[in-house]
Amino acid sequence: MAKIAWGRIAILLTVVFWITYVVTTIIREFIEAPGGFRFTMEAIGYLVVVTFLTFSATMYLLARQGALYRFRDHRRVPRAEIDRHFREHSGGITVLVPSYAEEPGVVRGTLWSAALQEYADLRVVLLVDDPVAPKSEEDRARLEATLALPGEIEDALRGPAARFTEARAAFEREIRSAEDPARGSEANPAASASPVTPAHLARLADDYEAAAIWLETMAEDEPMVDHVDEFFIDQVLMGLASELRLSLLALRAAIDQSALPDADRMLELHLRLERIFTVKASSFQRKRYASLSHEANKAMNLNAYISLMGHGWRAEESAGGTLLRRVEDPALADLYVPDTTYLLTLDADSLLLRDYCVRLVYFLEEPGNERVAVTQTPYSSFRGAPTRIERIAGATTDLQHILHQGMSYYGATFWVGANAVIRKRAIEDIVEIETVGGFEIATYIQDRTVIEDTESSIDLGAHGWTLMNYPERLSYSATPPDFGSLVVQRRRWANGGLLIMPKLWKQARDRRFRRERILVREMWLRTNYMASIAWASFGLLFLLAYPYDSRLLSPVVFLAALPYFIAMGSDLRYCGHRFSDIFRIYGFNLVLLPVNLAGVLKSMQQALTGEKIPFVRTPKVKDRTAAPAIYVIIPYLIVAFSLLTLWRDVLAQNWGNAAFAAFNAVLAFYAIRAYIGIRNSFVDIWLGMLNWLYVPDRAKATSKARAADASVPAGSAPATDAAGPASESAPKPVDWEGILYHGDRRLNRDLKRDNDRRRRAGASRN
């Protein structure tokens, strides 16, 4: 309660200090000492920057306050209620794990955490987006190892699944036999007794012990290479084993006390074991089929598989590749993709804790949640990161978990696509179908921007659906271990928010037209979520680069920011980090300033040109990823310019600006040393210079070859004369299938031919 009260005070103080600054500094200077045009423009610009930064700080405090309310009010659903709800549950769930050039060991942990989820009809599908025919032996070996993972998991679980399935079936047979109506007659007084016997309870306890031992044995055999492996062993495997042993303790206690659960509860306990170890795992490669979209992004990888669900497909070979044709009779299908009520999109470097599926689906099926389309627990970071940059990036991830929980309190939830449980009926409402090359391409999750989950959140809201975050930490995901991979991730995150803003405004207008109530706080939080990176980056750039008049500085600005930093430090300690990490995060944001600016500028470029920005996946490899040289050089320039500003302000006795410049210089240099590395930064700069100097080789065709190519129709062989072939190599056979399938594809090439001559229309008739 005290934390909630202090949170309210922090919001109030931030607003009061901002108003105080506007009145005592800006308005006062305008009235008492007008400074001309330049000072007026500086004052307006500085006020705009301070206002936007203060607004973002206030939104942080507001979202944090909502999270505190949710954590206070949350009550975990008892295990028995979940078991009762899912006893005869029929709605299946498909876990989709998109993967591209991932380390097989990383993907393996993700698949295991999904496969061990307790669910009645669980399917885990690995969506491999690697090239079907890798060029190198290393890539081929990695692809083969990745594709083999689903089969390995099914094989490993087949033994315990068969045992617990047979145990459950045997229990049901014995219970039905004991409840035979013939035995329930008045002549049989024992018929009124419970059909459950101590032998049933003892066998169930033995099964729980066997399940726990199986998981513990697997944990002992698992290699522990890094902190992610340690988390997988301790939290996924041993965590589940520990919970099963807790149930075993209860069963042993019931035996000792000569107590017997009823038949329904016994069946639920049997079903739990069976469902934990039962899974249908498979893999799918969309690039094997020419009729599916090959857009290089995660959203279309998911869309390609979702579009196949619930139908049978016949594979048809053509010159353009393998095509999938829909067939109505599943018996005639070469590929049948079962449909399920729910989907779970899971990044290839994420891990789920036990109960993730059952608790979130239970939440979706609670009364009043019929229009909730997506629910998830925003992922947290793995503990014990070996590098400073991974630890600080993880700290910011943990803060985002809190903020997303708070945004749900105000109805401003955004979908974070790493581990979302989705009601399939909801995304069928927002599907867009277009015809590309004669084939229908269904887009459920928008790929217009590289933050596809954010845009889909707006689309769902426009169709009357809502989103909600589940207030527990049940999912974890890896953070980039080096600066190069972090650049890729954060540049993508900074790109796209501005492009989606018009959709948000349109949704707000439509909701007002339908006379729906829209909270101002919801719109504030949504706007801040999508646009704060833009204004915060440009605002920080102005504060660093422009020498504002010292009369605009005031201690009140520092006081307005103080509640934000204190609250952030408190949240960091709550998440298991240090209070002093607020300074490390500030330096972290300084070195990421050029990355964020690049992402924002990319958004502006896309808005002006209409071109789709390529989706760049975050590298998930064990080797260090080199960062582009520009993102390494600019942090050094920030340090140099801050030192120059410090020197000028000291000479001018502008002590406020001097202190700010010194603060920036120290933290920026610390961030370079801690997060990039002095040696690594010079290596990346050198590699950037080499990449700029060298260009890839291109095959140079001779003019003779161009002329020959221009004169020979597509699919035809070169002409020969009596002396022999036209070239040293043997003529290629005519690709008759390609000609019949594609037709004449030379029209555009003919229009661009260099040796064309324009002639009068009647010249050819003369």
Can you describe what each PLM-predicted range is?
Residues 85-129, 602-610, 703-715, 721-724, ...:
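Acidic, Ser/Thr-rich low-complexity segments on the non-lumenal side of membrane proteins
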Residues 1-14, 96-98, 103, 511-534, ...:
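Loop-to-transmembrane boundary segments
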Residues 1-81, 97-100, 105:
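Hydrophobic transmembrane helical bundles of polytopic secretory-pathway membrane proteins
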Residues 55-507:
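Internal catalytic domains of large membrane-associated glycosyltransferases
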Residues 139, 150-151, 156-218, 668-766:
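Cytosol-/stroma-facing membrane-proximal "stalk/adaptor" domains immediately downstream
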Residues 22-52, 526-610, 626-703:
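Membrane-embedded multi-pass helical conduit in multi-pass membrane proteins
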Residues 496-517, 599, 675-676:
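C-terminal, non-catalytic tails of nucleotide-sugar-dependent glycosyltransferases
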Residues 480-495, 582, 611-622:
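Nucleotide-sugar-dependent glycosyltransferase catalytic core
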